[in-house]
Design a protein with these regions (language model features):
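Compositionally biased intrinsically disordered low-complexity regions
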Residues: 12-16, 35, 69
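Generic alpha-helical secondary structure signal
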Residues: 54-57, 67
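Short, charge/polar-rich alpha-helical segments
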Residues: 1-23, 55
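Long amphipathic alpha-helical coiled-coil segments
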Residues: 34, 61-74
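Intrinsically disordered and other compositionally biased segments
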Residues: 8, 25, 56-58, 62, ...
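Short E/K-rich amphipathic alpha-helical oligomerization segments
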Residues: 17-51
């Protein structure tokens, strides 16, 4: 498999992974927004999950950007 096609395939994989993680993060995000709107203290576990998923999304996006730069340089 050529380098370009391998990079394109890996970029698509990253995009799918980001969508999947964002879907998981939305549950804790909803709980956090609800707590804010009700002026309550957010659940610590929801905060931890939100931060965990946000970190994973950021890492995956950064990796995808590196792959795109590499693809453009070919």
């Amino acid at each position: 498999m050529s380098r370009k096609s391998r990079l394109k395939k890996e970029i698509k994989t990253c995009q799918k992974k980001i969508v999947e993680i964002e879907r998981r993060r939305s549950r804790s995000q909803s709980a956090l927004v609800q707590a804010i709107l009700l002026q309550e203290e957010p659940n610590d576990q929801d905060v931890e999950w939100f931060n965990k998923y946000t970190g994973e999304i950021t890492a995956c996006r950064n990796h995808m950007l590196e792959l795109k730069k590499e693809l453009e340089s070919l």
